Swiss-Prot record:
Plays a role in peptidoglycan recycling by cleaving the terminal beta-1,4-linked N-acetylglucosamine (GlcNAc) from peptide-linked peptidoglycan fragments, giving rise to free GlcNAc, anhydro-N-acetylmuramic acid and anhydro-N-acetylmuramic acid-linked peptides. It is found in: Cytoplasm. The lineage of its organism: Bacteria, Pseudomonadati, Pseudomonadota, Betaproteobacteria, Neisseriales. It catalyses: Hydrolysis of terminal non-reducing N-acetyl-D-hexosamine residues in N-acetyl-beta-D-hexosaminides. This is Beta-hexosaminidase. Belongs to the glycosyl hydrolase 3 family. NagZ subfamily. It comes from Neisseria meningitidis serogroup C / serotype 2a (strain ATCC 700532 / DSM 15464 / FAM18). Its EC number is 3.2.1.52.
């Protein structure tokens, strides 16, 4: 069977279960789609996951980019057969107790194990690291954050990024310009952060500046309003994305929207309007999760935005190690020692009350 050549479009969709239905195959063959994000509902065991990712990648060329939210702690989509990853705050605790060097070493090992295990299963990308500061205000961020100190967050995220690269993965810093100060969960409400730009620059934006200089591949903006900067949520704001992120910070990588079905995105209009405004604001790729009917709505009469960099940016996010090479790495004593070390950092309470973050069913 001839595999159709379909350039990757600017939409990342999802699927319902462990295998592709015929309807889902047709949806993923649409030129609007360029990638797919997987959730817990798509994982039964490692062999099933490998079969699913191979099936997805066989649909078209260039292959769809396959992503997952696999941060560690409360947000780890795949559990059985994978190393249990610690909450990122565990690395911050090591920073405080044992110093920067020990914490950075641990972060590098976490990144390496995280990426290699996913690479072995055909996954291209995990949406990590979380660059939000832990101000103690935001339960949905909480221990997903490395630390409250911007310097610690930046250094630990950079170490994690280096580990990800060893496992064949790029980094995606989130949630620009910072979700940690607000109380609300943008999956459920539209939070407001009333601080000034100068206050944000002095704290929350610092990790984004540093990571951008150090090769961060992608950024995901927050569905949060910062009314002293713009009345629109950051992910729909040209001020935040084109002016502050691109021009002022100098970020040259990929901008992914956060999920456009989240409550924090719903005040902007219907899905087509949300996508249009996201693209106009500066997003390269939009995520539409948990609502395949809305993906179909978006596909109708969809006009792919003019973005000459899209193909290159998609390709930049592709895995660089490959499944077979990653599986070979996993057989080495050195990697197995890293797995044991990382597993020793995790604790049962890491999963408490939060493993469904971002999942609707």
């Amino acid at each position: 069977m001839t595999v159709p050549h379909i350039p990757r479009g600017p939409v990342m969709a999802d699927i319902a279960a462990f295998r592709l239905t015929e309807e889902e195959k047709q949806r993923l063959l649409d030129p609007a789609v360029g990638g797919i994000i997987l959730f817990r509902r798509n994982f039964q065991n490692i062999e099933q996951l490998k079969t699913l990712t191979a099936e997805i990648k066989a649909l078209r060329t260039p292959e769809l980019i396959i992503a997952v939210d696999h941060e560690g702690g409360r947000v780890q989509r795949f559990i059985e057969g994978f190393t249990r990853l610690p909450a990122m705050s565990t690395l911050g605790e090591i920073w405080d107790k044992d110093g920067a060097s020990a914490a950075e070493t641990a972060a590098g090992q976490v990144g390496r194990v995280l990426a290699t295990e996913l690479s072995a299963c055909g996954i291209d990308l995990s949406f990590t690291p979380v660059l939000d500061l832990d101000w103690g205000n935001c339960p949905v961020i909480g221990n997903r954050s490395f630390h409250h100190n911007p310097e610690a967050v930046a250094h630990l995220a950079l170490a994690l990024q280096k580990g990800l690269a060893k496992g064949g993965m790029k980094s995606c810093g989130k949630h620009f310009p910072g979700h940690g100060f607000v109380e609300g969960d943008s999956h459920l409400v539209l939070p407001e952060d009333r601080r000034s730009l100068s206050e944000l620059e002095a704290a929350d934006l610092a990790p984004f500046h540093i990571m951008s200089r150090e090769g961060m591949a992608a950024v995901m903006p927050a569905h949060v309003v910062y009314p002293q900067v713009d009345t629109k949520p950051a992910g729909f704001s040209e001020i935040w994305l084109k002016q502050i992120l691109r021009r002022d910070i100098g970020f040259k990588g990929v901008i992914f929207s956060d999920d456009l079905t989240m409550e924090g995105a719903c005040g902007v209009g219907g899905l087509k309007e949300r996508a249009r405004i996201s693209f106009e604001a500066g997003c390269d790729i939009v995520l539409v999760c948990n609502r395949p009917d809305l993906v179909d709505e978006l596909r109708e009469d969809f006009r792919i935005p003019d973005n000459p960099a899209l193909a290159q940016r998609w390709q930049y996010m592709a895995n660089t190690l490959g499944s077979a090479a990653a599986q070979a790495v996993m057989q080495t004593a050195d990697f197995q020692e890293a797995q044991a070390f990382v597993a020793g950092l995790a604790s049962p309470q890491d999963t408490a009350g939060g493993v469904k973050v971002g999942e609707a069913f």
